[in-house]
């Protein structure tokens, strides 16, 4: 997989000459445009001579008025404007020659301060020099009283120190002159007098001038002094000195400051940059069209705030030149220099200043840095996400008559979206001579335009998108179908994937334009192809609500119905009998098996007749002829199960019906199983067709069933009052125990809650029995079929609401005894409001949290793409069932973890027979065989052990869950992994929302915060578990005042070595005396600190721990996520190493680099016979990992923009554009999917789809 564009983007410091070479002229005046003529002022910030003409090929003075492209490249002799296109005003830069050097604020203030590190100053000292508070010694000359780079602070509190420094130096000069009458002696004596008395001010300039005269010492202040010092740095020499110092102090001392300095020195040397370039002598002026002035209605103007910042610089620069010419006192000049420095700082990064420059509305002006960073910055707003043409949005409504690959687009919207294509069609078919005529036809609503529209919409699908787009199914393609009205019509089955409902949701429509885009939309994104959800490989298009209800009603059986016992010889005969009202839909009838499709039955079965209903005949007609006949709720073995409904013709049908037990109708669960089996057997295309038939049948019969719900359907439940009386008595008893001091407050609360929970459970059980007796009760039908609601809702309607949560989310002791049917009392209503409100507040907060989690996950994993077939990895990953060791229950069974993965080696049973050969994809069948053989641990190929330098291979990834086939090369599995973990994150959060705050339903505090804790690699203080550092046996547990000391003994070469672990107060122990422990084993309850685990037990232990813990959180919420997605994120978290010894490589001790970069350096060192570096594994949270990415563009667009860019500039980093984000920013095709493998195959698939649809 080669990167097709082979370009790199490099960022580095610009020298003054470089900036001048970019420039097209110097800006010397602060004016922008003339208020009368509204034309650009000469030499100002919008000058046409510098930046190019405002109108194409027209000059400023009016000599060249007519825009004539023939004049391109000429210059107007009168006004000097080059005649060219006005677009150059977006790219031509100017410059300002600064009267005095200024430092770049990033180099001074972004921590760690780069200039301070280079000059070995404290950043505070550096700032004092730059902002004209303190002087600095540039060269001590022959004076022994000063050191180079010493800062002379004149702040009131610190001037004492400076006075005592200057005193001896001046005394020395008096001795040197040795002439009491000399002018300088008199001057020196006056100075000494001022220095000795702290209340008298003294002139430091005078003092330093005198010292310089006699000792050749040099002093400086401001950026020019810093520039002077930076020029003095000899990189090679400094690198050598720093390395020697590092060697001298040894590896264990605190050497972080030296290492930082060495890093900067080496970076500058490697990237051929001079330190003094960090100080600006020339300031670039960005092109005027990027900082425009815009005229508003009413003749007023508004301008980009950057212009204000530039004006301020130019004004101060001019003033400084004037002051210098006039020969003003140094204090005035220094003040002007300081103001220029601050003006430049404000332009570059206003928010970093202690007192930012403010606009009229008292908020800081937006500087160049703030234009880059944040959600509204250039990176995220304009480079990673753009607004697109040919798009529209509207409210969605249900489209029950659509096919699964269609969407209804309102006619007016379609006309606007497809306007260019309509115009083209009208011209081609000679209804319009030119574009103008065609546009006029559209304006006048000519009937021909609708014919044109009908034709052109067949050429291209549209993309529908619903925000928030949490996973790849949030954007799908559909063939447009014109509909009346203004709402977009959406197929009811795709709503789950979009997480849409029809209560006012809006969706956006986009039209793909190019041939390739159209082909991709058709071949890869069509709604009818998205049958499976990528996160778990389960069908995502499961029917809901009305469709379930209709199918339930159609497959319902009842004895004693009209036409029961009628025998039919043909399917059509039975259906006609139903249509004419001879037989009811749910009556049990007989039909000759021979009349039904032959493939559905065995030879033997076809000799008898089948007991069924007309509804079931209609239901089975939606399936393919080779799909088994479904007559009951056993789907997996439908072919055998149907035997119990087939009778020999010798048996009388009425007799058979009398002995026959009614079977339950088809419910939601069965429909899901049918879809799964159907998909595996027939693929996406046929499944979509079947689903459309299922939908039509469902809607038809849910309408015919006339199911409604009213207060009359909800039976009153009188028994509850007896239970209440009994419970009240128990509670009174508990309270009296508490009053007598036999129970603590906590115990009392616990027991009361238990009593009321039991009551509610009991009422719920009894209600279930009551409900089941009336199988036609609409509430029962809805709950039983899975269409809507459940028994808990029903309990609340007629039984009791039960216990509620309080504002903190704890359970209250007072239950709500009323049901909704009776109505709640005022106090009960009040108690129930807490939970419901908390649910709403949680939802709002956690949705944002979850969205941010997804964003960070995408950033950490975006560069992972499937790049080849097999990496030939020499290591596998051993897995077993995920077991919650605390409660000893299975969270993820082994089968779920191995299906769809490749085996690493032969998997054999006890006898040595091979069940699955090496490198074979394990299907469901093989997985069952492995489990049947009693195997509990399996070594599989995993992303975690994949050997590819970049990306992963097909074998290590395994099956693509969204297509149920092997993953294709080019699949961006990193992003899919991030979406699959992030998308249910919102469900983790929304769970509290649906229960209306009913107690007992766990509020998800362990959910999202726990995931964040694991992936950010943080642990909450106080909840950290103690882990064993070495293997051994727990030889003793000593308890002293609630604090345990666990003693672990290990045997090393025959000697017993003890290690003691002190626990927190009242910590819960996880081990007993005599237990064997392995490194990393938990000794106390709590969450493990991942850094410690990595240190003690190595990477595999960390990988397994994160996998298990993340799975635990999701599975407890009933959400299934495939292991491989979590593995990808974990792979990225463990992808970095920290250099411990740099050997003879250019890597520095303490530097964090990616494993692939480290491997490259080691290989290179070995090849050249140098000592290779040594490093240890690092685990980085998903917040930190992207910032350490190989690509600086990707890191800068994630977070900490200024810091990432400053670092990249000093290192002169190159971005090889290997990830997805970098290429999106530059408008390239991403190196994934068709951008990697080419589009030919996709074009062919799309062509075939198109033929079949129209």
From Swiss-Prot:
Nucleotidyltransferase found in the keyword field: yes
Pfam families according to UniProt: RNA_pol_Rpb1_1, RNA_pol_Rpb1_2, RNA_pol_Rpb1_3, RNA_pol_Rpb1_4, RNA_pol_Rpb1_5
Subunit: The RNAP catalytic core consists of 2 alpha, 1 beta, 1 beta' and 1 omega subunit. When a sigma factor is associated with the core the holoenzyme is formed, which can initiate transcription.
Binding of Zn(2+) 2, residues: 871, 946, 953, 956
Matches recorded under SMART domains: RPOLA_N
EC number, UniProt record: 2.7.7.6
Keyword set includes Glycoprotein: no
Annotated disulfide bonds: none
GO CC annotation, single: DNA-directed RNA polymerase complex
Needed co-factor(s): Mg(2+); Zn(2+)
UniProt-recorded name of the protein: DNA-directed RNA polymerase subunit beta'
Residues engaged in binding Mg(2+): 501, 503, 505
Keywords: DNA-directed RNA polymerase, Magnesium, Metal-binding, Nucleotidyltransferase, Transcription, Transferase, Zinc
């Amino acid at each position: 997989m080669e990167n097709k564009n082979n370009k790199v983007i490099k960022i580095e410091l610009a020298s003054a000459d470089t900036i001048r070479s970019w420039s097209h002229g110097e800006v010397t005046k602060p004016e922008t445009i003339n208020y009368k003529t509204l034309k650009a002022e000469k030499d100002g910030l919008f000058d046409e001579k510098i930046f190019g003409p405002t109108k194409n090929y027209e000059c400023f003075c009016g000599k060249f008025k007519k825009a004539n492209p023939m004049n391109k490249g000429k210059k107007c002799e009168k006004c000097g404007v080059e005649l060219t296109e006005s677009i150059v005003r977006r790219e031509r830069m100017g410059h300002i020659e600064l009267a005095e050097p200024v430092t770049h604020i990033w180099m001074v203030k972004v921590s760690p301060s780069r200039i301070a590190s280079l000059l070995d100053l404290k950043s505070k000292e550096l700032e004092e020099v730059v902002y004209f508070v303190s002087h600095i010694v540039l060269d001590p000359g022959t004076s022994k009283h000063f050191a180079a780079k010493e800062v002379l602070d004149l702040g009131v509190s610190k001037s004492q120190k400076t006075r005592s420094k200057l005193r001896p130096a001046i005394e020395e000069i008096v001795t040197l002159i040795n002439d009491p009458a000399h002018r300088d002696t008199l001057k020196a004596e006056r100075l000494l007098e001022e220095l000795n008395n702290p209340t008298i001010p003294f002139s430091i300039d005078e003092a330093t001038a005198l010292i310089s005269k006699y000792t050749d010492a040099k002093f400086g202040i401001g950026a020019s002094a810093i520039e002077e010092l930076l020029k003095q740095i000899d990189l090679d020499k400094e690198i050598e000195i720093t390395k020697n110092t590092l060697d001298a102090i040894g590896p264990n001392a605190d050497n972080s400051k030296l290492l930082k300095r060495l890093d900067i020195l080496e970076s500058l040397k490697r990237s051929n940059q001079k330190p003094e370039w960090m100080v600006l002598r020339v300031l670039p002026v960005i092109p005027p069209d990027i900082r425009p002035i815009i005229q508003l209605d009413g003749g007023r103007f508004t301008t980009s705030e950057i212009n204000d910042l530039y004006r301020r610089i130019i004004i101060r620069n001019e003033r400084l030149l004037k002051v210098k010419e006039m020969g003003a006192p140094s204090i005035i000049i220094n003040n002007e220099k300081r103001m220029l420095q601050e003006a430049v700082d404000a332009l570059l990064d206003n928010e970093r200043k202690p007192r930012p420059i403010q606009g009229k509305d008292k908020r800081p002006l937006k500087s160049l840095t703030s234009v880059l960073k944040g959600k509204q910055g250039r990176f995220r707003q304009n480079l990673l996400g753009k607004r697109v043409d040919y798009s529209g949005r509207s409210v969605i409504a249900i489209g029950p008559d659509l096919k699964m690959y269609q969407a209804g687009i309102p006619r007016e919207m379609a006309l606007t979206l497809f306007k260019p294509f309509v115009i083209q069609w009208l011209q081609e078919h000679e209804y319009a001579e030119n574009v103008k005529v065609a546009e006029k036809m559209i304006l006048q609503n000519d009937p021909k335009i609708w014919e044109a529209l009908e034709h052109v919409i067949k050429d291209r699908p549209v993309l529908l998108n619903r925000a928030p787009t949490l996973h790849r199914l949030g954007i799908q393609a559909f063939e447009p179908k014109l509909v009346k009205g203004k709402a977009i019509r959406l197929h009811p089955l795709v709503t789950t994937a979009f997480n849409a409902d029809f209560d006012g949701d809006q969706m956006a429509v986009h039209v793909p334009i190019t041939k390739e885009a159209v082909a991709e939309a058709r071949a890869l994104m069509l709604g009818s192809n998205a049958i499976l959800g990528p996160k778990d490989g389960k069908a995502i298009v499961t029917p809901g609500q009305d469709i379930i209800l209709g199918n339930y009603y159609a497959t319902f059986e009842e004895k004693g119905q009209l036409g029961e016992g009628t025998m039919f010889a043909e399917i059509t005969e039975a259906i006609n009998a139903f249509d004419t009202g001879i037989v009811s839909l749910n009556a049990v009838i007989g039909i000759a098996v021979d009349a039904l499709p032959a493939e559905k039955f065995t030879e033997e079965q076809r000799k008898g007749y089948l007991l069924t209903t007309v509804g079931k005949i209609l239901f089975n007609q939606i399936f393919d002829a080779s799909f088994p006949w479904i007559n009951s709720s056993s789907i997996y073995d439908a072919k055998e199960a149907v035997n119990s409904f087939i009778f020999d013709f010798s048996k009388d049908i009425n007799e058979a019906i009398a002995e026959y037990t009614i079977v339950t109708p088809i419910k939601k669960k069965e429909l899901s199983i049918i879809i799964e089996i159907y998909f595996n057997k027939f693929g996406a295309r046929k499944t979509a067709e079947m689903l459309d038939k299922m939908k039509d049948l469902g809607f038809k019969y849910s309408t015919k069933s006339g199911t409604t719900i009213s207060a009359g359907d909800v039976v009153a439940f009188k028994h509850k009052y007896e239970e209440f009386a009994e419970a009240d008595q128990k509670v009174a008893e508990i309270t009296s125990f508490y009053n007598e001091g036999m129970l603590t407050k906590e115990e009392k609360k616990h027991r009361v809650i238990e009593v009321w929970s039991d009551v509610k459970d009991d009422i719920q059980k009894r209600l279930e029995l009551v409900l089941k007796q009336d199988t036609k009760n609409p509430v029962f039908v809805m709950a039983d079929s899975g269409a809507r609601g459940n028994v808990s809702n029903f309990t609340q309607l007629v039984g009791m609401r039960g216990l509620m949560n309080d504002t903190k989310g704890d359970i209250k002791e007072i239950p709500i005894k009323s049901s909704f049917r009776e109505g709640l009392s005022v106090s009960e209503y009040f108690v129930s409001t807490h939970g419901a409100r908390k649910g709403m507040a949680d939802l709002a907060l956690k949705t944002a949290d979850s969205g941010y989690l997804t964003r960070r996950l995408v950033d950490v994993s975006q560069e992972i793409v499937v790049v080849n077939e097999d990496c030939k990895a020499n290591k596998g990953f051993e897995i077993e069932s995920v077991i919650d060791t605390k409660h000893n229950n299975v969270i993820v069974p082994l089968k779920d973890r191995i299906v769809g993965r490749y085996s690493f080696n032969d998997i054999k049973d006890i006898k040595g027979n091979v069940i699955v050969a090496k490198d074979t994809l394990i299907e469901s069948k093989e997985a069952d065989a492995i489990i049947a053989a009693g195997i509990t641990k399996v070594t599989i190929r995993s992303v975690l052990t994949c050997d590819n330098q970049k990306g992963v291979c097909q074998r290590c990834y395994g099956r693509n869950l969204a297509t149920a086939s092997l993953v294709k090369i080019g699949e961006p599995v990193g992003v899919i992994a991030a979406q699959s973990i992030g998308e249910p994150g919102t469900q983790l959060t929304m769970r509290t929302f649906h229960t209306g705050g009913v107690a007992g339903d766990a509020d998800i505090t362990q959910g999202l915060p726990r995931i964040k804790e694991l992936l950010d690699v943080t642990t909450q203080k106080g909840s950290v578990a103690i882990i064993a550092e070495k293997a051994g046996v727990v030889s003793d547990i000593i308890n002293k005042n609630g604090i345990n000391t666990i003693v672990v003994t290990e045997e090393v070469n025959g000697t017993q070595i003890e290690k003691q672990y002190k626990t927190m107060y009242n910590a819960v122990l996880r081990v007993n005396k005599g237990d064997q422990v392995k490194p990393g084993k938990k000794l106390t309850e709590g969450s493990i600190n991942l850094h410690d685990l990595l240190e003690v037990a190595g990477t595999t232990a960390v990988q397994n721990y994160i996998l298990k813990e993340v799975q635990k959180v999701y599975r407890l919420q009933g959400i299934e996520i495939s292991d491989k997605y979590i593995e990808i994120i974990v792979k990225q978290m463990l992808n970095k190493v920290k250099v411990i010894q740099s050997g003879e490589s250019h890597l520095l001790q303490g530097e964090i680099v990616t494993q692939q970069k480290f491997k490259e350096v080691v290989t290179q060192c070995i090849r050249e016979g140098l000592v290779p570096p040594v490093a240890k594994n690092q685990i980085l949270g998903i917040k930190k990992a992207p910032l350490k990415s190989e690509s600086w563009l990707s890191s800068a667009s994630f977070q900490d923009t200024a810091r990432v860019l400053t670092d990249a500039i000093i290192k002169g980093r190159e971005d090889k554009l290997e990830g997805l984000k970098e290429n999106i920013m530059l408008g390239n095709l991403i190196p994934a999917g068709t951008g990697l493998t080419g589009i030919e195959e996709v074009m062919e698939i799309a062509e075939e789809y198109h033929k079949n649809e129209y």
